[in-house]
């Protein structure tokens, strides 16, 4: 089976030394001469959607306005209606309808696309990515006391240092 592309949490890229503003498109990784395109999943979009007002998502996306950027939001579908309280938030209170309205309103500079639509643009470069997972899972996979220590270190660290803090391996 040939897989041409995938999406991974941006923490993989941060652990390799990339900055958030660099992660605006797909990258290529390789092993033994076999190539795979990788789209970084933007953690800020994951945390904004659907828990912040839709305008905050648009405001964040505006920080990339004018650039030829691809930002990926991919996450568990259950947070859009199955998790406790999310059905009311997303549908009853209209979060999703508001977001779609704002996407239409901002369509002069903002568009949505499928991964396959973004493959025509060149790769942003080569990226060798470590085995890791998103921060919370790397924290949860540690023994309790070490998990608490990592949480305290995370909370006390500057935002630009946080991507360099790694917890345990997610298969523990």
Feature locations, PLM:
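Active-site and substrate-binding clefts of carbohydrate-active enzymes
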Residues: 23-36, 40-44, 62-172
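A Trp-anchored, charged/polar loop motif used as the substrate-binding/catalytic surface
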Residues: 46-65
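Short, glycine/acidic-rich beta->alpha junctions
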Residues: 1, 53-56, 91-95
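Short acidic/polar capping segments at secondary-structure boundaries
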Residues: 11-12, 43-45
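Acidic, His- and aromatic-enriched active-site or binding-groove loops in soluble protein domains
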Residues: 2-34
């Amino acid at each position: 089976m040939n897989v041409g592309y995938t999406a991974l949490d941006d923490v993989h890229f941060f652990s390799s030394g990339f900055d958030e503003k660099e992660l605006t498109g797909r990258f290529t990784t390789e092993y033994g001469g076999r190539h795979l395109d990788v789209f970084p999943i933007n953690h800020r979009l994951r945390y904004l959607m659907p828990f912040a007002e839709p305008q905050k998502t648009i405001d964040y996306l505006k920080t990339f306005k004018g650039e030829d950027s691809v930002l990926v939001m991919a996450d568990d579908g259950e947070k859009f209606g199955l998790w406790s309280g999310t059905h009311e938030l997303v549908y009853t209170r209209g979060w999703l309808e508001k977001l779609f309205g704002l996407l239409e309103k901002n369509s002069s500079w903002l568009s949505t696309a499928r991964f396959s639509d973004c493959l025509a643009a060149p790769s942003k470069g080569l990226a060798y990515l470590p085995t890791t997972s998103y921060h919370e899972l790397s924290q949860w996979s540690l023994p309790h006391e070490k998990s608490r220590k990592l949480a305290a270190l995370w909370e006390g660290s500057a935002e630009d240092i946080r991507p360099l803090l790694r917890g345990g391996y997610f298969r523990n």
